[in-house]
Amino acid sequence: MTQALLGRSAAELQDWAVAQGQKPFRGRQLHDWIYAKGARSLADITVFPKTWRAALVEAGVDVGRLKEVHHSVATDATTKLLLSTEDGETIETVGIPTDQRLTVCVSSQVGCPMACRFCATGKGGLQRSLQTHEIVDQVLSVREAMDRRPSHIVFMGMGEPLLNSSAVLEAIRCLNDDLGIGQRRITVSTVGVPKTLPQLAELAMQRLGRAQFTLAVSLHAPNQRLREELIPTAHAYPYDALLEDCRHYLDVTGRRVSFEYILLGGLNDQPEHAAELADRVGGFQSHVNLIAYNPIEEEEFKRPTPQRIEAFRRVLERRGVAVSLRASRGLDQNAACGQLRRQQMAPNTPS
């Protein structure tokens, strides 16, 4: 396997260059070429002597970029990339543009073990977790494909980030320090893994010096019974325990928790569900992000009507819960929330 340089800090690259018998400035050049100029391989870094570049490649060292397999653009300009890893696995990442920002939805694993019924990613199971450079590459690949600097990052692609917390936190450090994306513009989404939330804040403080990224917890139901129907792994994490761990995260970091809630027509979208949800999450600083269901082939769930969605939102609002509705982006290219999977679609835009 290639020894990847992507994902390393400026200090680490400088130390690495010195260990290779080079001057410290070579490490600074390497950092600039990898992060600012977007070098895909050592061959691109023309300021380095050819003999040294060749020797490094011979020794199994390279930048560590992924290969773009497919590139599709939705009618709303949302861009989905299918990327291939060195061992032949594939992952998807999505660039979501607006006039003011470019959000990159990154994957943290190849596949996902959580098997949420409404999500396409979990249908294929988990292959492995991604390494730090494979996570960071997704942001660089979207920047390259869309010719625009990403402003926000959401760990809402393939995989459960808290089952790969070490690589995810190191990727956050890299995105923050090396690509200049503020932690407050980074969101880490989790469906909830027992014992990981209490550790996350402490680990982030150790690894990052602070924990300023947003934690988004996927609830998708107002009670334990319904949550277990939608999320098979929820049986191991009682609803009350999950909320208590969210309160602990808030106490340690001072950062409010965002709760994700996918609305499924006739299943969890009734006014009584909204009232019950308000009773559960209204007791501490939080925010509810409503997401209308995005269809996948394997399930027959229905997307609620706009009227039903608005009624649900109003119940939460009247009960004092901060709430917003996430717009679905990239639907016509299966690039919306819950639709990512490891597959190549018919050609759309050449890579």
From Swiss-Prot:
Binding site for [4Fe-4S] cluster: C112, C116, C119
Annotated residues for binding of S-adenosyl-L-methionine: G159, E160, S189, S218, L219, H220, N294
Disulfide bonds: C105-C337
TM region(s), chain numbering: none
Lineage: superkingdom: Bacteria
Domain Radical SAM core: 98-332
Swiss-Prot/TrEMBL catalytic activity: adenosine(2503) in 23S rRNA + 2 reduced [2Fe-2S]-[ferredoxin] + 2 S-adenosyl-L-methionine = 2-methyladenosine(2503) in 23S rRNA + 5'-deoxyadenosine + L-methionine + 2 oxidized [2Fe-2S]-[ferredoxin] + S-adenosyl-L-homocysteine; adenosine(37) in tRNA + 2 reduced [2Fe-2S]-[ferredoxin] + 2 S-adenosyl-L-methionine = 2-methyladenosine(37) in tRNA + 5'-deoxyadenosine + L-methionine + 2 oxidized [2Fe-2S]-[ferredoxin] + S-adenosyl-L-homocysteine
GO biological process assignments: rRNA base methylation; tRNA methylation
GO molecular function: 4 iron, 4 sulfur cluster binding; metal ion binding; rRNA (adenine(2503)-C2-)-methyltransferase activity; rRNA binding; tRNA (adenine(37)-C2)-methyltransferase activity; tRNA binding
Keywords, in A-Z order: 4Fe-4S, Cytoplasm, Disulfide bond, Iron, Iron-sulfur, Metal-binding, Methyltransferase, rRNA processing, S-adenosyl-L-methionine, Transferase, tRNA processing
Presence of keyword Ligase: no
Database matches in NCBIfam families: rRNA_mod_RlmN (TIGR00048)
Other known facts: Reaction proceeds by a ping-pong mechanism involving intermediate methylation of a conserved cysteine residue.
UniProt-listed PANTHER family: 23S RRNA METHYLTRANSFERASE, RADICAL SAM CORE DOMAIN-CONTAINING PROTEIN
Primary residence: cytoplasm
CC per GO annotation: cytoplasm
Cofactor binding note from Swiss-Prot or TrEMBL: Binds 1 [4Fe-4S] cluster. The cluster is coordinated with 3 cysteines and an exchangeable S-adenosyl-L-methionine.
Name listed for the protein in its UniProt record: Probable dual-specificity RNA methyltransferase RlmN
Function: Specifically methylates position 2 of adenine 2503 in 23S rRNA and position 2 of adenine 37 in tRNAs.
Active site: E92 (proton acceptor), C337 (s-methylcysteine intermediate)
Family: Belongs to the radical SAM superfamily. RlmN family.
Cofactor: [4Fe-4S] cluster
EC nos: 2.1.1.192
InterPro entries from the UniProt entry: Aldolase_TIM, Methyltransferase_A, RlmN_N, RNA_MTrfase_RlmN, rRNA_lsu_MTrfase_RlmN/Cfr, rSAM
Subcellular compartments: Cytoplasm
